[in-house]
Amino acid sequence: MLRHAVRGWLAEHLPGAAPAVAVALSGGADSLALTAAAVVEAATVDALVVDHGLQPGSDAVAVAAAAQARTLGCRSARVLRVRVGSDGGLEAAAREARYAALGSARAGLPVLLGHTLDDQAETVLLGLARGSGARSIRGMAAYTPPWGRPLLGVRRADTRRLCADLGLTPHEDPHNRSAEFTRVRLRTEVLPLLEDVLGGGVAEALARTGRQLREDGAVLDALAADLASAAADAGDLRIETLATAPAALRRRAVRAWLLDSGAKAPTDRQLRAIDALVTAWRGQGGVAVGGGTPGMRLVAARERGRLTLRRQARSPAR
């Protein structure tokens, strides 16, 4: 099943001759099973093992994972040691450090990640609980270069089964059982309860919902990009062009424009306030968005029939 998933992913996203890929290997069952399948289906596989240094003995775990990768037939296996910061919490900081290390070490190759259907279900449920809109419950994409996820249709139980069949001993990360992490509690408490109450099939349904929303979102994003292009005027957006568009497309177009102009991802509240500059103009002031620099902030405003994004000096703290 895993080989079929990897083969299908390679055929869809990297068509042509059998490609070379990198695999992000933690030593856990998911990434270990992915590595085992990839060495059979891809031309060559380089394993990249990230040691976050967050637990005693993590260096030995990383070295053991690299050794397993070589035994499975990887062309190379490298241990990448990173320093995890504290911004945004431990989970987010570790993820940021991991992706940065993988991005630097991949040598131009696509990097396969071991996210499974179960991970996808957790991601969709977490996004739904946070109420951040359809974009947050699309889940993870099968391929956002250079990151590939061939196992999004595979259950976690299947990766464990393959490891057992191959005589592989995956590492059991203590963090994956720690109730201090939100995702762990979703995995061990919330999803099992939903499966029990609703009679099963919840993980598959959540993953399917995420996939459908991602497909729909891709179409809406393309239409919004066309709208933003039509409204573009020397870095600004023409109000008259935006005003006649459906609200959902207009907000998507404004969001894309903000991101392209250097702003951070805007909140729903910020987007709606900016939308009011287009559709409910009463002379109100601009809307501050994230992405400024020390001493400066980014402000979206309405000026002479256009939406503008300007840097303004921050008011001194009192």
UniProtKB/Swiss-Prot annotation:
Its EC number is 6.3.4.19. The gene is tilS. NCBIfam families: lysidine_TilS_N. This is tRNA(Ile)-lysidine synthase. It comes from Nocardia farcinica (strain IFM 10152). It catalyses: cytidine(34) in tRNA(Ile2) + L-lysine + ATP = lysidine(34) in tRNA(Ile2) + AMP + diphosphate + H(+). Ligates lysine onto the cytidine present at position 34 of the AUA codon-specific tRNA(Ile) that contains the anticodon CAU, in an ATP-dependent manner. Cytidine is converted to lysidine, thus changing the amino acid specificity of the tRNA from methionine to isoleucine. Keywords: ATP-binding, Cytoplasm, Ligase, Nucleotide-binding, tRNA processing. InterPro entries: Rossmann-like_a/b/a_fold, TilS/TtcA_N, tRNA_Ile_lys_synt, tRNA_Ile_lys_synt_N, tRNA_Ile_lys_synt_subst-bd. The keyword tRNA processing applies.
